[in-house]
């Protein structure tokens, strides 16, 4: 359940391009403690001419290490900027937003 949104600083833990124009990024933030897959965060570009955060869905949460995983497609100036971020980069995010969904263990094939 969404307990209110906060603008906080997060740190890029890992990022890689997994397909042309598609990026996999892990962010370290205390917001991970209350996040669930299916919710989303707003990621603010460092370029102050781009005022609004870019909404990106959370696809995985590592609560033990306070990390969120987002996978996004470069679709404009904001996400183009994000694609250049390296581990250690500090970014402003807004979250946690939306409603998540439970992840159930599969029953196998």
Where do the model's predicted regions map?
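Ferredoxin-reductase
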Residues: 2-86
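FNR/FR-type flavoprotein reductase catalytic core
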Residues: 80-109
């Amino acid at each position: 359940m969404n307990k209110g949104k906060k603008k906080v600083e997060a740190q890029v833990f890992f990022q890689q391009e997994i397909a042309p124009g598609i990026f996999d990024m892990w962010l370290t933030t205390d917001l991970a403690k209350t996040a669930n897959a299916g919710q989303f965060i707003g990621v603010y570009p460092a370029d102050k001419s781009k005022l609004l955060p870019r909404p990106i869905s959370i696809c995985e949460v590592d609560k033990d290490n306070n990390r969120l995983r987002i996978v996004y497609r470069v679709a404009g100036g904001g996400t183009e900027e994000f694609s250049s971020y390296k581990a250690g980069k500090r970014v402003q995010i807004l979250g946690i937003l939306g409603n998540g969904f439970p992840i159930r263990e599969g029953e196998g094939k």
